[in-house]
Amino acid sequence: MAIPHASNETSYLLPPNKEDWEGQGIPDFVYEQEELMMEGVQWPRGALSLLNTPPLSHFDSALCSAWRQRMELGLFRYPLGELPTQTLPGTVGFVAQLNVERGVQRRCPQNIKSVRQEFDPEQFNFNQIRPGEVLFRLHRKQDCSGTVQQEDILVVINVSPLEWGHVLLVPEPARGLPQRLLPGALRAGVEAVLLSSHPGFRVGFNSLGGLASVNHLHLHGYYLAHRLPVEGAPSEPLDPRGRLHVLQALPAPGFLFYTSRPGPDLEALISRVCRATDYLTDCEIAHNLFVTRGAPPGKATSSSALSGVRVILWPRKPSFGIKEGEAFNVALCELAGHLPVKTAQDFSSLTEAAALALIRECLLPPAQAEDVRAALVALIAREEE
């Protein structure tokens, strides 16, 4: 991934001497609501490469320059080069990537037994990360529009990256928040997508039981220079006011929330999504969530029509720990159509049918899925007019 050097990138770089890292403090990335780009970000025609995208935003330049420096300094568990990538033949459009190192060297998952498990300070958490792993602190200026004051969020490298720019969005670690989605964390994730001028910067969340490996509140963010099926997949409304839709198309059925406007509409979306995830968590239903630029709800459309932001929520069977022997584990990116594969043999032999079979194993039984659907429809219907 070719990243231009930003003129002010030194603000987010570590000092030359390692001894100075801890004393440097965490730089703030300050932004305003006007910098959130709802329109004008599209996939380029032709090759799906960053070389053909519009100039990267201030956010992209800050993140990528700081992330690249940490890679050069050896703060990751392995160096990440260009990953072998293929689009699987078939109707879905799965993007498979070979990432052997992540499959071997990622941190072992914690002993999780419940979607509602409390934070345990004795387990690994983000208060224990090394100096230098934090890139910057996201800080939104408060404006006069009456929007909710956004809490500060740390942007931290994922030391076992699945793709370029793979970071974690972490609310103040000292609060000891368990892995349960909160509005402030989701807002930061959606706004990070809107701060990026790259159409392939995505954000996601894995619940406990949805393959979250650390029980300390965090979201994932990363770049993938490929379109994904969920960007333009068709949907059907579940609510007459268009507040909740269902994606029936492959890779997996899920619930779609969409907005094309910042401000109150975005706040309403965040509230709806978190009410839905609260319901799932309270009912011990594991779930995954994916945030991407995408098309409005409705009929299938060209995935180049990125006119707003899509938040897709998938309730799923709980899965605690990593399954060995599978080509990939099903979490936020796999449900969206991005398949990080663990071995060269699986990468060369993987088919669309095999990928769909692995994903289907993680979906709720039909009767339970229908119950969840009815509950979420009722939840949205109770929203204040």
Curated annotation (Swiss-Prot):
PANTHER family: GDP-D-GLUCOSE PHOSPHORYLASE 1 (PTHR20884:SF8). The orthologs in A.thaliana are GDP-L-galactose phosphorylases catalyzing the first reaction of the Smirnoff-Wheeler pathway, the major route to ascorbate biosynthesis in plants. Belongs to the GDPGP1 family. Keywords: Cytoplasm, Guanine-nucleotide releasing factor, Hydrolase, Nucleotide-binding, Nucleotidyltransferase, Transferase. It comes from the Eukaryota. It catalyses: GDP-alpha-D-glucose + phosphate = alpha-D-glucose 1-phosphate + GDP + H(+). GO terms for molecular function: GDP-D-glucose phosphorylase activity; guanyl-nucleotide exchange factor activity; hydrolase activity; nucleotide binding. GO terms for cellular component: cytoplasm. InterPro entries: GDPGP. It is an enzyme of class 2 (transferase). Specific and highly efficient GDP-D-glucose phosphorylase regulating the levels of GDP-D-glucose in cells. It is found in: Cytoplasm. GO terms for biological process: glucose metabolic process. The active site is at H218. Its EC number is 2.7.7.78. This is GDP-D-glucose phosphorylase 1. The keyword Transport does not apply. Its main location: cytoplasm.
